[in-house]
Structures are given as structure tokens and as C-alpha cells.
Amino acid sequence: MILFAWKRYALLKQQKHAGWKIFIALMFMAALTSCQKSAPDNAEQRSPEPLQKITVAYTYQPQSTLVHVAVAKGYFTEEGLDVQPLMHTYGKAALQSVVENKADFATVAETPVMFNVLKGEKIFVIANIEASSMNNAIVARKDVGIISPGDLKGKRVGYTPGTTSDFFLDSLLTANGLTRQEIKPVALKPEEMQDAIIARKVDAISTWNYPLTQINRQLGADGTLFYDREIYTETFNIAARQDFVQKNPETVKSFLRALIKAEHFVTKNPDEAQSIMSATTKIDKNLIHDVWDAFNYHVVLDQTLLITLEDETRWAMKNKLTERTDMPDYLSFIHLDSLKAIEPEAIRMNR
């Protein structure tokens, strides 16, 4: 009898213990189910923020390679930016889009920056993205007697006002003992130059790539090129309105980070970068390859920019291309802080 009671007691205890196990298991399953049900809600809460839309005015020129690559490789998207492209044939027009508040960023050489500062526009250069001492030149027709730069005297020379074409022309003339008054300058848009020289409306033109190499190729044996790496170094830059930069500091940093990624890609993969440029600009890859070595693609802020801006300002004042008579404080138009925050070694400029 005692044995039977003991067995019954043990059985009840075992059942009670099993009941607790079942209860705990059920509670665990309920908690797990609750977590699974709430997972989509948590995932929704953690979903990435929508991309910030920005408009970038940039050119088909080789100087804008880093922007083309950053778009094609998705680097802007990785940095939270949705780039709306606004394409231009040259940087002066791209910068005008920024000045008119049609774009947030522009790729542009330093000469249009200088003229806009002299006009009182509140812009910042936030980075240099390219530099070259071999991108600008004068291409001339030999069959009109132009063999050396001195032969430009009395000839019709095409140029694009307010651009590096304008400044380089005067620099080359001065270096060869000539003045603007001793030639017949003809103002042309970049896209008009090739037809003008082929149709003999001008005898020479001052321009940049790609048109420079395209025109020289078309002229063949009748063409000649005048470079001078000692008199001018072009910088191609990212410019933006000062108020935009001040109100959107994180956007500016994200933009620069994407360009730095593009710089690293271009350095390691030049052939693929050339393919990207060919695909995005519809320009023959052989032409892109032929001019590639003329350019240095680095995201920096270099002292060269400051020196060139001041040199070009003196030129503009001397030639009465501006009403200003005092040198602007160009450092106040160069925004160092954003690039310094993400890549301090890229700052090569003295305050």
C-alpha cells in the first residue's frame, strides 16, 4: 500500500514537472512568434532614409571624368545621393546653372570661377578634381602660313570668351611677343570651333580637349599644335553656391566622398574608366585613350588654384575685362572645411 502511494506521488510530481516544461515551452514559442511578427515593423523602422536629390551640372569633357565614373559606379547612391544630371558642353555654362539656382554643383575650370567672383557671385570651390598643363593649346592651319606661334600675327584666331581658351590665348601670345591687338580674335562657342576652322572662317583656334585633338586629327598634315606647359596649368573644380554649402554640410561631404571613391577607381582601373567615359559621353574610346595622360585626376584643394585665380584676375584687370580694380580675397571663395573633414591630406593650400 505504501509502495503504491509512493508511486502515485512520484507520477503526480512527474506530471507536474512535465506541465511546467510544457508551459515554459509554450511561453517561449509565444515570445518567438511575437518577435517574428514585430520583425517587419522593426525592419521598416530601420529602412534606409530616402536618397537626397541633387542636381549636378557637369560636362562631356575629360576633366569631368570623376563625376561620370561616380555616377556610373553608383558611388553617389552609396553616399545617399540621387544625382540628377544637367549636361553641358563646357564648364562656364555648367557654372551658370549653379549661379541661376538650376543646379547644386558644377564642374568648371578656374577662369569662369574668377569672372563670377569678380561679378560678385557668392560661390565656393569645394574641390579640384583635375589638373593639366597639356589640355589647352592652339591648333592652326599650316596652309595659311602658320608654322610657329609668331605666325599668328594678323591671323583670325577663334576663342571662347570668359574661359580657359581666352586666358591661354593671351598667355601664349605674350610668351611669344604678341598682343591681342596684333591678331584678329573671333569669339566662338566650343561647339562652333571645328566647323569654323574646317570651313576656313578662322585660321587657328584656342581650345581644349576633346575638340582640340579632334580638330587636329581632321586637319591632318595641314594642322599644327602650339602647347606651352610652362605658362598655364588648368584646374577643373567643383563649385557650388555659398548658401547651399552652408545649409547642406553633410550633403557636401557625401558628394566629396563619392568623388574620392571615383578617384581611387580611376587610378586602379584606367581602361575601365575610359570605357565608362566612352559609354556616357558617346565619344570614341580611342580619342579618350589618346588624351588620357594629359590629365591628373585627384580630389584636392591645391595652392595652384589660388595662384592661377590671382594671375587671371590681374590679366582680366589689365585687359579691362572687369570693372574691378582690387584683388578679391579668393580664400573666402574656397571652402576648405568639408574636404578637410573627410580627407585632411587633400588640403594642399595655405590659409
Predicted features along the sequence, with ranges:
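Bacterial signal peptide processing site
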Residues: Q36-S38
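Sec-dependent N-terminal signal peptides
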Residues: F23-M29
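Short, glycine-/small- and polar/acidic-enriched structural segments
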Residues: E44-T179, K184-A187, D203-N209, G223-F226, ...
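Secondary-structure end/capping motifs
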Residues: K247-E323
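Bacterial N-terminal signal peptides that target proteins for export
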Residues: F4-F23
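Conserved C-terminal helix/tail region of periplasmic/extracytoplasmic solute-binding proteins
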Residues: M317-R351
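C-terminal motif of bacterial Sec signal peptides marking the signal peptidase cleavage site
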Residues: A31-S34
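Pocket-lining segment of extracytoplasmic ligand-binding domains
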Residues: T111-P112, P185-V186, E191-T280
